[in-house]
Amino acid sequence: NGTVAAVAQASMPSVVAITTVSVQEIPSFFGYSSRQYKSASTGSGIIVGDNDDELLIATNNHVVDGATTLSVCFIGDDVANAETETVNAGDNGDLNVEDAVSAKIKGTDADNDLAVVAVKKSDIPEDTLNQIKIAQIGSSDDLAVGQQVVAIGNALGYGQSVTSGWISALNRTISTDDGTNSTGLIQTDAAINPGNSGGALLNMKGELIG
């Protein structure tokens, strides 16, 4: 098993920041026409595979749900600037962002809060392609309470942040805002902030476990 620093160094090239933009409509009042406005949110993702043309990135469904525009920042990219550029851009077809790459949703599983997004390899600068890598996948079946873990994600939209803690409990069940229950969850005391959604929880071998 490695140190937190070693796990972070090995795993950060597999973690991305995701910016999403959705268009919402404000209803009209007093006879005025309705208005549309853009709202941006940030999350994280993990590079889990590829094919000849694309990188495949796993994230949470709630990170990308309802998004009309998606962009992905890799290690070393300016996440804050990319968010501003993405909001100011048009739809995905018009997206031309210096510090990020356009992405599209490949599939979603709302019940398990999972989604996969894809990025064209041809859109990624060569020096970035040489840095990033596919995450090592571990098994959550082998976890134990008290085991040390590392969390990496786009905390608060500032870019990649690393925190560490311990597995506090396994197989937790929580109720979500829509009244459904999520089961089999890992509880950790590693700091998790808004923007971490979709990011990596790793064991001390650097393997993805959640």
Q: Where are the predicted features?
A:
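Serine-dependent protease modules
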Residues: N1-G210
